[in-house]
């Protein structure tokens, strides 16, 4: 075992990476494999309500010596303010995003509520791509669907 996080999909990726590195060292792969970035792997708890997270917590950033307001900021949004949550009667929960300053890259994200384990995927990808939250992300799934229906 390599170590945490002890998740089946992580173990599968580690095994594939191991085989790729062996193949690369033997000259059977034309590029060096990209190392795993464990900070972009979401953790999901399939309970009710669901809980999901990716990246750093505020505590971890403070332990690294980063300061809230100077190095990062935190935004939190309740499910109770989302139209979809109201329509589906699943208003319990929130989304919390920790973004770096000054760029606005996603340092961490935490979701508690209905479909949290699905919603975390977009924030995991944003973290992986170092997407800047200061820009509006387009297209969003809902706007894409709406535009397709108009065609």
Which residues are covered by each model-predicted region?
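Active-site metal-coordination segments of metallo-dependent hydrolases
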Residues: 5-9, 55-56
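Short, flexible active-site loops
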Residues: 1-4, 38-46
């Amino acid at each position: 075992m390599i170590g945490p996080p002890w998740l089946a999909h992580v173990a599968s990726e580690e095994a594939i990476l191991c085989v790729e590195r062996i193949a690369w060292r033997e000259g059977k792969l034309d590029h060096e494999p990209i190392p795993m970035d464990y900070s972009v792997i979401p953790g999901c708890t399939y309970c009710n309500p669901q809980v999901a997270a990716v990246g750093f917590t505020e505590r971890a950033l403070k332990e690294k010596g980063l300061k809230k307001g100077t190095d990062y900021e935190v935004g939190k949004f309740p499910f109770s303010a989302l139209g979809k949550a109201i329509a589906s009667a699943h208003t319990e929960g929130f989304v919390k995003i920790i973004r770096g300053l000054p760029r606005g890259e996603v340092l961490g994200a935490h979701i508690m509520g209905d479909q949290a384990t699905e919603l975390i995927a977009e924030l995991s990808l944003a973290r992986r791509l170092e997407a800047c939250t200061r820009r509006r992300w387009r297209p969003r799934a809902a706007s894409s669907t709406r535009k397709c229906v108009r065609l």
